[in-house]
Amino acid sequence: MLSRKMLAVHDISCVGRCSLTVALPIISAVGIECSVLPTAVLSTHTGGFTGFTYRDLTEDIMPIEDHWKSLGLTFDGFYTGFLGSYEQIDLVKTLISDLSNDNTTIYVDPVMGDVGKLYSIFDSEFPKGMCKLCEKADVLMPNLTELCFMLGLEYKEGPYTWDYIDQIFREAEVFGLKKIVITGVSFEEGKIGAVFKDYETGATGQVMRDAIEGYYHGTGDVFGSALVGALESDISLNDSVRIAVDFTVGSIKRTHESGADVRYGVDFEEGLGEYNRQVRIASEGISFEIVDSDLQVARVAGMAARIWSEFWADKLKEGQTEYMVNKFQSFQPIKDSIDKGYEYYILKSGGQDIGYTGFNFEEDRVFISKIYLDRDYRGLGLSAQILDLIRVRALSEGIHKAYLTVKRDNLQAINAYKRAGFIVSGQADTDIGNGYEMNDYILEWSF
């Protein structure tokens, strides 16, 4: 894929991680060319600092655009953030119209408030002006405060219900968006994150994480920049939101644990390598290598020994993991199951073996025996690609159902499968020998 050219239109605070000082490094970290157009220059951002300097750059916007037009420049994406006046909103609308191409995507973060209040520099009419820019957006990235002000709705403190958020999604249809991601949403005490809707497909979702005590400046810009970088890398909305949430939460955690002065923003720099890795994996996806040789069986057995000993270490009785690997997932049992009709696939990313899956066709459904990933590749949305492989193989055999078993206290896996469309259909208690028993739920999936 050719590198896309992004223009970030924000202010620049010389000290304090926010706006352009986070947008440029984060978006560039995933290989996207990021040009900048500063709307103002501040000595520091305005949160927690006094005596800061502020130079408005409104008068520079059109001369800069005129020079770019003379060079024949267009941009594949625009990412707008803090705009300090109605005039800047109008100028940015013109900029977008003049410098877009047929494939341009418009990302708007309507920075103007938080926690139910507008920032002090904005009057009560400013949200109406920002609405005009939002009508040009393909992807809108407000917090709930900003969205309520623009829609003329009363801001309510959380926790929220999904019905309330769904109502907000419907109200936001007025902007004619393709996608919306709303930050600062909580459905239960101690959890906070982002919700999203793809208006083109109707798909909705949420990504919630543990709340961290305190208020951290610049996190909206960190999140928005990470989201833009992921979406511009051709990653799904669901995975892009997850990556952006985890990147932001990781930045907050590092800052909280270090005891750093929160006025200077969050420590996002240390997480750029992991952010790049997650974007690369999600963008490239995984490849599947069918297991049909003894050497490949040995590779699967090696992964099973490694992954099982790590994953099940604190979940099974002493000695049970080693017993189960030897009985079910060592070389000979895997080879025997393949001889009986099971299909095994090695999962690969970047040329490396990262996991495996195994399944068997029965009369009218598929039994999914194994889906295992190395620790560093869990939680990256890869299970959806594995399930899609199984679904496609099943449909090729005229089968529309699958099932699997999950340990009844493995709530994380159960919830993940439920999100993928599985339902709990029963229980199974299986004596596997040597005094061990597996107590599982049976989960079924129709497609």
Say what each PLM segment does:
Residues 121-204:
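Conserved phosphate/ATP/ADP-binding segment of small-molecule kinases
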Residues 238-285:
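Charged C-terminal helix
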Residues 14-15, 204-218:
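Short pre-catalytic strand/loop immediately N-terminal to key active-site residues, enriched for Gly-Thr
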Residues 216, 352, 374-388, 395-397, ...:
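Conserved glycine-rich acetyl-CoA-binding loop
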Residues 2-108, 112-120, 269-280:
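Conserved N-terminal subdomain of the carbohydrate kinase-like
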Residues 214-237:
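Short, small-residue alpha-helix embedded
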Residues 285-376, 387-393, 397, 425-430, ...:
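Acetyl-CoA-dependent GNAT
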Residues 403-407, 418, 423-441:
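Conserved catalytic-core motifs of GNAT/GCN5-like acyltransferases
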